[in-house]
Structure formats: C-alpha cells, structure tokens
Amino acid sequence: MELTAVPATQFSSVQLTDILNACFEAYLVPVTQSVEGFVQRFSAEGMSLVDSRVWLAGDEPAAIAIVARRGSAARLAAFALRPAWRGKGLGRKLMQELLMLLQQQGIETVFLEVIRDNHAAVALYQSLGFTRRYGLCGYLSTELLPRCRAYYSFIPPCPCFGAPLRRVTASFPGCWIRLPSPLCHVRS
C-alpha cells in the first residue's frame, strides 16, 4: 500500500501525540509522551507543523516526522514508523521525500540525533549522507544543569521592533535541545 504524506497542521496535538507514541512502539527504549509533554517539548524546540509530516496508509498513521526549524536550519526532532511498517525500506523513501521537501522550503542544513545502538537508523542516515559529528550521552538528574555555552552577536535593529536583535548561535547542534529558545530575541 502506498503511503500519503500529510502536513502535521492537519492533526491536533492529541492526535500527533497518539501517532508519535504508536510509531515509537517497540522502540529500543520506551518512548511515551503525554499531550502536555509533547506540546512543551516540541514547542520549545521550535517544531514546525508546516514542515512536519504524518504518513498515512489509508486512514491509519504509519509514520511521523517532527521537524524543528530555525531559519535555514532544521532538526529532525523525531522520525519513526509503526512496527508493521519497519524493515521494508520505507524509512529511506520517506526520509528522501522529507529532505527534498525541506530543501524546497529553503532548508540548507539538517541535524538529527540517533541512538548509537539503533543500527538500522544509523545505517539509514549514513546512506542519506548524514555524518556523525558528536556523541551524545543521556543522563537524568534532579539538579539543574549548567546553561549551554552560546555565542552572542548583535545584528542591526529590526524595523518591526525598533530595537536591536540578539542572535544566539549554539556552540554545537546539541545546544538546539539544551537551549531550545528561538535564535533571535528582542534586546531589552
């Protein structure tokens, strides 16, 4: 059966959360989001519902891609297929389709993270031209983590705000998550 790509704008937060949870069923690690967690996480990361996709088999969701966007850079915040659709070469086809769409929308750079032991996903992303840049480690702490180091530069005043904007450039793509606020802020 052919899958149909549908922009995430066509779904509610509740539906997207349910689809994400279904697509991550039987994943390497448990992935379950509440609606509130979904909205908080992906909103903070700059989720673009316009660029994000759900692939349908008839009326049934088969796959999802959550894309966060900042200017001409995008981050694949989540990409998963429901278990019944895995291992059929669809991940490659859907990723090629998504990357082509992002390129048409002016995206020049795409970042993503993948669990090192997810050999199928690592092979998929490498076959699409992605290269390993950083190793990420996951930790859980009850203490506050130090802020992400970032570099600040000032750019000319924005006529909309009548004040200079401060552009924050993360020191490495992992700061996208640790510093999920927008890259430009009005300077007070």
Give the residues covered by each predicted segment.
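Short hydrophobic beta-strand segments in globular cytosolic domains
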Residues: 62, 120, 131-133
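Conserved beta-strand-loop-alpha-helix junction that forms the acyl-donor binding cleft
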Residues: 82, 112-121, 139-143
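Conserved active-site tyrosine of GNAT-family acetyltransferases
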Residues: 125, 130
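Active-site rim helix/loop that mediates acceptor-substrate recognition in acyltransferases
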Residues: 20, 28-66, 167-188
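Conserved GNAT acetyl-CoA-binding A-motif
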Residues: 102-113
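Conserved acetyl-CoA pyrophosphate-binding loop and the N-cap/start of the following alpha-helix
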Residues: 85, 89-97
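A short beta-loop-alpha structural element at the N-terminal edge
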Residues: 2-18, 150-172
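Conserved acetyl-CoA binding element of GNAT-fold acetyltransferases
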Residues: 68, 72-84
